[in-house]
């Protein structure tokens, strides 16, 4: 008996998929970086922040997905006053870039 109706889906390109749960204490963030195949972030707990270079900081709330395309420079982490638990899914490689400065990190956050 199948668990699907109308046919069965196929699994594609799953060998290099990475799924991580990252717990960021308040005030902790990544460096700027890119992913060769993009990155899907989902906040599980707390308040998270993310930013594409040159754009406004975006506040992440639990249950909201955030997609970064291939080669897009970005960072993500916790709010300065609240920790966060982030689920990240990506494949390919990560290129680590320069640190996010305090001035960049403390910039005005907006909700998309």
Where are the regions a protein language model picked out?
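A short, N-terminal "cap"/entry segment at the start of jelly-roll beta-barrel domains
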Residues: 1-18, 31, 95-112
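Conserved short histidine dyad/triad with adjacent acidic residue
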Residues: 18-35, 70
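Short, conserved beta-strand element in jelly-roll/cupin
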Residues: 23-25, 34-50, 89-92
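Ligand-binding pocket scaffold of soluble enzyme catalytic domains
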Residues: 28, 50, 84
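Short beta-strand His + acidic residue motifs that chelate non-heme Fe in jelly-roll/DSBH
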Residues: 32, 50-51, 68, 73-80
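Short acidic-glycine-tyrosine-enriched beta hairpin
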Residues: 54-71
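A short hydrophobic beta-strand segment most commonly corresponding to one strand
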Residues: 67, 82-99
